[in-house]
C-alpha cells in the first residue's frame, strides 16, 4: 500500500513525513484552500525532501499558462487534477508540462454506482491518466472535507490504480488494506489544524498502514534530512 500525505505548508512537517516513510507528498495550489501554498513556499517544501519521494501538485481548474508557470518554478513530479477538468483537458494540460497525472473524482454515494464509477475511470484511463483518486463528494468544495463515501462503490476491476481519499485517519485506515486500491491519501486525519501536521498522527497513520515495516522498528528522527 502506497501512502500520500497532502496539504503541507511547513518544512518541518514535510521532513517528518519523509522520515516516517511516506511515498508521496501533496502541495495544494488552489488559493481558496486553507492548505494552499505559494510558489515560494512550494520551492522551500520540495527542497526539504530527499530523493525518491514524489511531489504531487494539486490543482483545481488551473489555466494552462498558470500550470506552465508553476512547472517552470516548482520541481513537482505528478499533477493531481482536482477540479472539473475533462479527460481531454487533463491530457492536454499534462502534456504541456510533460508530467504524469492523476484525476480526482468526487463520489456521491446517493448518485454513483460501481458501474458509473468504473465508467468514469475508463474515460480518464483512455486519456492517459496514471491513477485515479476517489474522494467524497461535496456540493461546494473540491476536497479536503474529511468526509467518507461508501467504499462498496469501489470497482473490483478498475482500469486504473485507485487512490482512496476522504475521511481517513489512523483509526480507520487499517480497514482499507483489503480494498481494491493501490494507495491512500490523507490530509485532515494527520493534522492538528488546517495545514499543520501532527507528528504523532502521521506516525500512527504510517504504523497502521505499513505494519510490516513498523513491527520491529521505531524509526529514528535524524536531523539531516532535507538539510
Q: Which role fits each region the language model picked out?
A:
Residues 1-227:
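Conserved N-terminal beta1-alpha1 strand-loop-helix module at the mouth
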Amino acid at each position: 500500500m502506497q501512502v500520500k500525505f497532502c496539504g503541507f505548508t511547513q518544512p518541518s512537517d514535510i521532513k517528518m513525513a519523509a522520515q516516517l516513510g511516506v511515498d508521496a507528498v501533496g502541495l495544494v495550489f488552489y488559493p481558496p484552500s486553507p492548505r494552499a501554498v505559494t510558489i515560494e513556499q512550494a520551492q522551500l517544501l520540495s527542497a526539504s525532501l530527499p530523493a525518491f519521494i514524489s511531489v504531487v501538485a494539486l490543482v483545481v481548474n488551473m489555466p494552462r499558462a498558470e500550470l506552465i508557470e508553476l512547472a517552470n518554478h516548482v520541481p513537482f513530479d505528478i499533477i493531481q487534477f482536482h477540479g472539473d477538468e475533462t479527460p481531454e483537458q487533463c491530457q492536454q494540460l499534462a502534456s504541456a508540462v510533460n508530467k504524469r497525472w492523476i484525476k480526482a473524482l468526487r463520489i456521491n454515494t446517493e448518485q454513483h454506482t460501481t458501474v458509473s464509477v468504473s465508467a468514469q475511470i475508463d474515460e480518464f484511463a483512455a486519456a492517459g491518466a496514471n491513477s485515479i483518486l476517489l474522494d467524497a463528494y461535496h456540493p461546494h468544495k473540491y476536497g479536503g472535507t474529511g468526509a467518507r463515501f461508501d467504499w462498496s462503490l469501489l470497482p473490483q476491476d478498475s482500469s486504473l490504480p485507485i487512490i482512496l481519499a476522504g475521511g481517513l485517519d489512523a483509526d480507520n485506515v487499517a480497514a482499507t488494506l483489503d480494498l481494491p486500491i493501490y494507495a491512500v491519501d490523507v490530509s485532515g486525519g494527520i493534522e492538528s489544524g488546517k495545514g499543520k501536521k501532527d507528528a504523532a498522527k502521521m506516525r500512527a497513520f504510517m504504523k497502521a498502514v505499513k505494519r510490516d515495516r513498523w513491527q520491529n522498528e521505531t524509526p529514528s528522527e535524524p536531523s539531516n534530512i532535507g538539510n
